[in-house]
């Protein structure tokens, strides 16, 4: 099961919803759950914003995908961290961030204990050239947003779902949208907590047999 949380502190997530969470579940946190994180201080043990989340991931045996505003020196990144059973696998920074944030040049995917996870941060899902990791195959595709529901991002997620044959889950601050492997919006849920079932699918669309060539013709006149 995929549990999504927004507009709630992490301690309250544990207190109010902890009994519902089982090993192998996946938790998605939007940016306001942890807010601004000083990454050097966090990794150096001087702050503990992420420590509780990492320990909870290990104790529960779950994957946690948490959005944040990551601070490194004077630079601020719009980021998402993937934590698998107590291990921070990495951090994805938005490639195309708004003014005031530093953009990244690397699109990351994560080989977790539940399979390959592809993560898109905010508007990055609207750029097809950033889909390469997902198109190469993955089990889960998540798009974590720091805004309310966005029609353009949902439309792009529907196209990505069709292209990959996988479910795509878009989490916004006010809602979550689960899109099936054929690009249909299967469910939209509102509120600070929502739960989705994302079945493993192998829908890849129709396949043309034989070798295909692509030609570009020019006007000779």
Locate predicted features.
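A short, sequence-level motif marking secondary-structure junctions
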Residues: 94-98, 124-125, 191-194
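Active-site beta-loop-alpha junctions enriched in small/polar residues
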Residues: 7-8, 69-71, 93-97, 173
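C-terminal beta-strand edge segments of enzyme domains
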Residues: 102, 109-114, 173-221
